[in-house]
Amino acid sequence: MKKYLISLLLLFCTLIGTAQEHKSFDTSDWKRIKDLYASRPDSIRNLVKTLTSRAPKSPLTTEESLLAYIGQSYISQGKEEKILQEMFKALIKGNSDKAIASARQVLAINPISLPAIVFMGREACNMVGDSINTPINFDAEAYYRRIAKCILDAISSTGDGSISHPFVVTSEDDTRFFMHYQLRLKGIKRPEKTGHRLDFNLPCNSDRYNRAAISFDITRVIELQKQLKQQ
């Protein structure tokens, strides 16, 4: 067990070293995470389990949260995407019950789906008293907010939003949630896709981001989309 933990820590060091130098993942880093999933998927599952624990003994570091965020995409393989879109459609139609049911289905597949986590956090106050799904003395809103913050901080650590150092995401939907909740950017328009990158021109800045544009690395998103088309 100690040997596996040491190997995992060495991977963290490699990942964060790359993030500090380049502020982005490169091809070799994606391969390392993919190889870790292939050889030790439980190591990623344990990180996700800790991240989503109601009372974690020791909170994950940003580096660990990042590995959980990216690693989970290799476990769930984007299988939650169709249900996630059903959640969005239900929200547009004002059907909260359907949206909540869809969000729970999404989280059953991907426990750290950022859109589902954020939505459940917002709806937590409306679910107070639900004895089946809300245990006594459990602050659901704080629980979902904590997980969302860990994921958002993890994405923040991958770059600065420039073309040279784009933020890394594993879902296109995560880009807008990141811009809205982490960077407080508003009025976001449709992005331009350039290779493995999504570029947004920003109509205005915020106190957390002052560039005229913001870029995201969607390498993993493209991989997942190709896999889903082949199924």
Question: What would you call each of these model-derived segments?
Answer:
Residues 75-80, 121-133:
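Short coil/turn linking the two alpha-helices of tandem helical-hairpin repeats
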Residues 112-113, 148, 152-155:
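Residue-level recognition of tetratricopeptide repeat
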Residues 20-100, 163-231:
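N-terminal alpha-helical interaction modules that lie
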Residues 1-25:
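Bacterial Sec-dependent N-terminal signal peptides
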Residues 105-106:
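Canonical positions in the second alpha-helix
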